[in-house]
Amino acid sequence: PKCVAVGETGLDYYWKEATREQQQPLFRAFIRLACMYNKPVIIHNREANHDIINLLYEEKQNGNLRNLRGIMHCFSGDSEAVKQALDLNFYISFSGNITYKKSHLPSVIPLVPHDRILIETDAPFLSPVPHRGKRNESAFVRLTAQKLSEIKEWTLEETGKITTANARRIFDISN
């Protein structure tokens, strides 16, 4: 076994269990750790996109993150957030929330190039339709893949091959 990434780490302003001032130094430490060991960082972002992006750009400009790369886990941002994440050398991972009727994510998914897109379950949360509101499980990732296939106009097989190749690349996993 080997470590393939650092995280999930990030900023979460939704729960208010820890202040911004408490969270940000720890987040900086984790992203520096990922870069020190040349590992991708998996970023959790809940109501903190502005601070996460600014912090990453600031660290990168200070020369602390020469080999910064990672995954924007369970992405829920807008088109600007997609552009910023891609500029920072991140992959963008989507979960079951892309299947929700009122989700804005189907409009941003086309902005993500095929070589930077991933899917995930975020189990036990964010179950895709028709399981919304129930406990999520790994088997439901197929529903997320089907929705992604529909949006990207790929076959389900193409989606599987693309997202698997991307996961292998970002996590440096050989066949």
Predicted feature residues:
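Conserved, mostly hydrophobic/aromatic
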Residues: E8, A34, H73, A85, ...
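Distinct, well-ordered alpha-helical segments
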Residues: N45-G63, I71-C74, D78-L86, H104-I109
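Short acidic/histidine-rich active-site segments
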Residues: D115-E137
